[in-house]
Amino acid sequence: MVRQIAPSGNVVQPGCSEWGSFTGFLILILSYVASPQCRTIFQVSHSVSASSAPYRLSDALNRHIPGLKSTLLLRRRKEIDGLEIHRTPARRATDALRRHLAHGFDILLPERRKDLPFSLNVLGMGFDTAQMEKADVVHLHWIGGRTVDFSQLCHIRRPLVYTLHDMFACTAGCHCTMDCGLFQDECRGNCPQLGAPRLFRNIPAWLFSRKRRAFGRIPSLTLVTPSLWLKREVERSCMFPGRKIVQIYNPVDTDLFRPAEDRNAIRAGLGIPPGAFVIACGATGLFNPVKGGHFIPLVLEELYRRGHRNLHLLLFGNQEKSVDYPFPSTNAGFITDMNKLAGLYSAADIFLNPTLQDVLSNVALESMACKTPSVTFRTGGVPEAVLDGRTGLVAQQGDLNQMVAHCERLIQDGKLLQTLAEEGRRHAEQTFSYPVIAARHAALYEETFREYRYEE
């Protein structure tokens, strides 16, 4: 049973100058220590890595908020410290059934787009609610697919905070809407991602309705979006009527992601010739329609056609297929060491990020913190990180010529490149750093904890 009392304070909104200053941060810490209420937070997610938002948030809270302990609660723990979600014995037997259901879904919908993720969240994993209730606040992150059963969330007798890292929570099951607006009308109609035969075209609407009923039964649920763009998208959906939605950016560790002391030494170690203009980009997304990686070879070919020869391409991540580039390239492979990743960002002059839909873009935050400006498209929440003409250059979505022109401008204008790099570092420290984002989350947890009480 839930008894709701008046909230004790206001949720910190983005852009408040007091949180961008040391004074505002110090006031929050002192008030928190003087009257500690919310002590333990569980960050619930399918799995995490050292580069994922749940891990970084938990790390930021533990390092910068005295008296608060954040613990990762994961379906798959892997090498990251944390706890595993306790599954109920009865639900362990449903693992095989879930796999068969997913296979049957593909058989029923042979035209479904395989290059875009779609999660059913049917027969999700049952979990031990008593384990969740050891926390003061339960913070949900990547819980789609088989991580937890949404219908069971209402049984957790603790206030829930849910960060939406993509569009999954407010759609029938797709994670990237790619300009589809059906989620505004309960996903009724012919879903462009599923390509369902007429007989099965009601599946998205049924999935949407099922998910909305599950969320509607949760007594205490506060939504967090990592960008203003996603906040507006969630408000357009009818999935969460009347729910509080707060915008708080994802954090980046600006002590870790910072300019390297000797960039030339890193370049030499990578075999990059002295004096080359280095363009970095992600190799993993080259064939992902959401990441827009197909623009990368097109941009490079046009730069070559325009006479630029002293360029070097630095790739991060696993490249699924061989691609011919007009310039020498170095592929650093899949990086798990964040110190090494920071060094790679520092080795580059610019980061080419042609994503076509992104909530915020962690790679933009990381490169910016390392004083490496991004050239990117105006899409999703990316322009909130890459401020056009201040911390990077932003082209209209899909405009190849403008993206090439932006790259060419930075190749030719070293003074502008340096200005963007300096301002980008300041923007990262003032807006996305661990202390700033940890303070905003701590304030939200405290308000959520005080606003709701659960009677045993």
Where are these regions (language model features)?
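Conserved acidic donor-binding segment of nucleotide-sugar-dependent glycosyltransferases
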Residues: 388-389, 393-400, 409-415
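Conserved donor-binding/catalytic core segment of Leloir-type glycosyltransferases
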Residues: 272-291, 297-300
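Membrane-proximal helix-turn-helix segments that form the acceptor-binding/catalytic region
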Residues: 155, 168, 184-224, 238-241
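Nucleotide-activated donor-binding/catalytic signature segment of Leloir-type glycosyltransferases, i.e.
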Residues: 310, 317-342, 350
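Aromatic "clamp/platform" in nucleotide-sugar-dependent glycosyltransferases that forms part
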Residues: 356
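Short hydrophobic beta-strand element within catalytic cores of glycosyltransferases
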Residues: 373-376, 386
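A short, well-ordered alpha-helix in the C-terminal region of glycosyltransferases
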Residues: 402, 409, 416-431, 437-443, ...
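Carbohydrate-associated surface elements
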Residues: 229, 251
